[in-house]
Each structure stands twice: as structure tokens, then as C-alpha cells.
């Protein structure tokens, strides 16, 4: 009788262990993010969709960006996107290689100035917490 209970308990733990290990590798693409995080959202399986210049929300990359890019006035893939939307003349791409789009600025110098300030702040913040 004890061996039947022990066997049932072993099967229960084995089943539970299989489900837990399957979900360990799954990326959760929810929550707030920054396009400057590397990788964005804590996983390269997720994308950070900006709603502001330095803040966004995490999503799986399945076609979400194409819809968002067309709807958002400042998201761009090229300088032509910015001019077409009337949001600027220059598409400044994020310095994060996981982000394949940029933000519209009035000029290249404005984009360089903004990104240099942000990356310096992030660098100083990461050095001070280390």
C-alpha cells in the first residue's frame, strides 16, 4: 500500500517538474520597457514598442511593429517616413541593435545630441550601481 502511494507521489512530482521546466525558458513579453535596454524587455524574443522617446511596452515581434509604426507619428524606419508623417526630417535609430526602427527628429544633430545625453546617463547609472 505504501509503495502505491509513493509511486503516485513520484508521478505527480515528475509531471509537475515537466511543466515547470517547460515554462522556465518562455519569455514574458509584458510590461514597461525602454528601447535603450539591451536586450529589450529582458529577452531577445521580445520587442520594445516605444510610446515615448524613452519608454515603451513589451510585445512579441509578430507583426506588431508594422501596425504600430504606421500609427505612431514619431516611429520611423527612414528619413522619408518622418517627412511623410510631418514629424521631422531625420530618423534617428536607437543605439540598441535589437531595435530595428528609430524616432523622428528635426535634424541629425538633434538626434545625436539627444542619444548622447541618454546613453551617458545610462552608462553613469550602470557604473554607480556596480
Curated annotation (Swiss-Prot):
Q: Please outline how this chain is modified post-translation.
A: The C-terminal glycine may be removed from PA1b.
Q: Which residues form the propeptide?
A: 64-69, 123-130
Record InterPro entries = Albumin_I, Albumin_I_a
- What GO molecular function annotations does the UniProt record carry, in alphabetical order? nutrient reservoir activity; toxin activity
Tissue specificity: Major component of both the cotyledons and embryonic axes of mature seeds.
Where does the UniProt annotation place the signal sequence?
1-26
Q: Which UniProt keywords apply?
A: Disulfide bond, Knottin, Seed storage protein, Signal, Storage protein, Toxin
Which domain of life does this protein belong to? Eukaryota
Please list the disulfide bridges.
Answer: 29-46, 33-48, 41-58
In this record, what's one Pfam family? Albumin_I_a
Provide the domain comment. Answer: The presence of a 'disulfide through disulfide knot' structurally defines this protein as a knottin.
The entry's function note states: PA1b binds to basic 7S globulin (BG) and stimulates its phosphorylation activity. Involved in the signal transduction system to regulate the growth and differentiation as a hormone peptide. Toxic to various insects through binding to a high affinity binding site in the insect gut.
Protein name, as recorded: Albumin-1 B
| Source organism of the structure | Pisum sativum (Garden pea)
Amino acid at each position: 500500500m505504501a509503495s502505491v502511494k509513493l509511486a503516485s507521489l513520484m508521478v505527480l512530482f515528475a509531471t509537475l517538474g515537466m511543466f515547470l521546466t517547460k515554462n522556465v525558458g518562455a519569455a514574458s513579453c509584458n510590461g514597461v520597457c525602454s528601447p535603450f535596454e539591451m536586450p529589450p524587455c529582458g529577452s531577445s524574443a521580445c520587442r520594445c514598442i516605444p510610446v515615448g522617446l524613452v519608454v515603451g511596452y513589451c510585445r512579441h515581434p509578430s507583426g506588431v511593429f508594422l501596425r504600430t509604426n504606421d500609427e505612431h507619428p514619431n516611429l520611423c524606419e527612414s528619413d522619408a517616413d518622418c517627412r511623410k508623417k510631418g514629424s521631422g526630417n531625420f530618423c534617428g535609430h536607437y543605439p540598441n541593435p535589437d531595435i530595428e526602427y528609430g524616432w523622428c527628429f528635426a535634424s541629425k544633430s538633434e538626434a545625436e545630441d539627444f542619444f548622447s545625453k541618454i546613453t551617458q546617463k545610462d552608462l553613469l547609472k550602470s557604473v554607480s550601481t556596480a
